[in-house]
């Protein structure tokens, strides 16, 4: 239990450093590690490393809800956590300027046991300016998030805690959010219900700002022999000893407020995506891959390999994929959401 006022002040200091640090990535990693450490110490939920980390996953009709343990472990991905915190901070700052003196409402769907992306910002924005609703499908995560908020002295910043499936949640008419926050995704928007959640919630709060602002998936031909053995974040720039060789094939799919609104009339289990053409590869070692780029808000971007969310995934839907063929994509909704490629004759 955290009772020491000095620890709470240290948490505030670390939050400000996480939002502003612009130097060596190793220092940022240390800042986030300390920040998450305080969250973990404040939480009722503790990671049991003797158990399968997938214990507690929920396979819903809209995608996989990862376990509380997995959600807690995700907080330690320093670049991911920092870029989401910075994007949400800027989105809130803009909303406060527009709504003042009324408080800004933030709905955090899929909070995990630490409410990692909300609690630090509760130390930056007073409850008179920003109120959070913390929602998760796992009762243990909500109980833990509540303990974190309480032990850090931030109870007044939370308007409500909700145990609910975000894909089925009905937003109260007197609590329409100004910002919708969800980070319930994996590479290329596979498996997890980010698309379904944002589509469902934005339909009820059509004027809300969404965080992340954009999740874009692009296709590239990749020379796998020239990809690094050790994954290097794109934002660091490639070392001089290797240069990736990637041929752009074009955009495939984007999740943002505009595309979500364009899907309003669609009622089936698929969403439209783009087609790409496969050119003749310079060498047999080239294979088509999907790349994910996440804009949390404004200038705050997760690029290739910055986190597990922006790893690359090979397109394996089509056997014997040859030059000159075209692939038509669509996004499949349901229990196993993902981008699906079909060969065009």
Residue ranges of predicted features:
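Class I SAM-dependent methyltransferase Rossmann-like catalytic core
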Residues: 57-96
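Conserved SAM-binding loop
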Residues: 145-146
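Conserved hydrophobic residues forming the short capping helix/wall of the S-adenosyl-L-methionine
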Residues: 149
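Conserved class I S-adenosyl-L-methionine
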Residues: 100-114
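Phosphate/oxyanion-binding active-site loops and adjacent basic polyanion-contact surfaces
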Residues: 73-85, 110-117, 137-141, 190
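Conserved SAM-binding loop of SAM-dependent methyltransferases across substrates and taxa
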Residues: 112-128
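Class I SAM-binding transferase module
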Residues: 2-11, 15, 19-39, 52-61, ...
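Short, charged beta-turn/beta-strand-edge "cap" motif at the junction between a beta-strand
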Residues: 331-337
